[in-house]
């Protein structure tokens, strides 16, 4: 089992690497999901997520999550063939957590190569936790 600390990692790059791991058969747990970052302007990012969240109706969807762990899991799902058996099995091997659960306190965390926040050329970024709070989550 691979345990990844999402603190300071770019969400999209993290998600694509995790999707590859899952499709190859690995079990992956991601901790500190609220500390992963989305690159870009804070205002623009908030507006984009507000549009996505308010799309559709309560009755018919689409249903978009507000909690940071579920936002990250939904992002990984978008990079998998989740409607097919292979993708469903891969999603079953993924666990995402806000903070660090008790069972992972002593685990050795792995970082994803090439997904560090230091590769951003500017300081324009927002954490998933901030986006989640903007959407009304109380995590």
From Swiss-Prot:
Gene3D superfamilies registered for this protein in UniProt: Ribosomal protein L13
A Pfam family annotated for this UniProt entry: Ribosomal_L13
InterPro entries for this protein: Ribosomal_uL13, Ribosomal_uL13_bac-type, Ribosomal_uL13_CS, Ribosomal_uL13_euk/arc, Ribosomal_uL13_sf
CDD domains from the UniProt entry: Ribosomal_L13 (cd00392)
Alphabetized SUPFAM superfamilies for the sequence: Ribosomal protein L13
Keyword vocabulary terms for this entry: Ribonucleoprotein, Ribosomal protein
Coiled coil ranges: none
Alphabetized NCBIfam families for the sequence: L13_A_E, PRK06394.1
Assembly information from the UniProt record: Part of the 50S ribosomal subunit.
PANTHER family to which the protein is assigned, alphabetical: LARGE RIBOSOMAL SUBUNIT PROTEIN UL13, RIBOSOMAL PROTEIN L13
Function: This protein is one of the early assembly proteins of the 50S ribosomal subunit, although it is not seen to bind rRNA by itself. It is important during the early stages of 50S assembly.
The protein, known as: Large ribosomal subunit protein uL13
Organism: Methanococcoides burtonii (strain DSM 6242 / NBRC 107633 / OCM 468 / ACE-M)
Name of encoding gene: rpl13
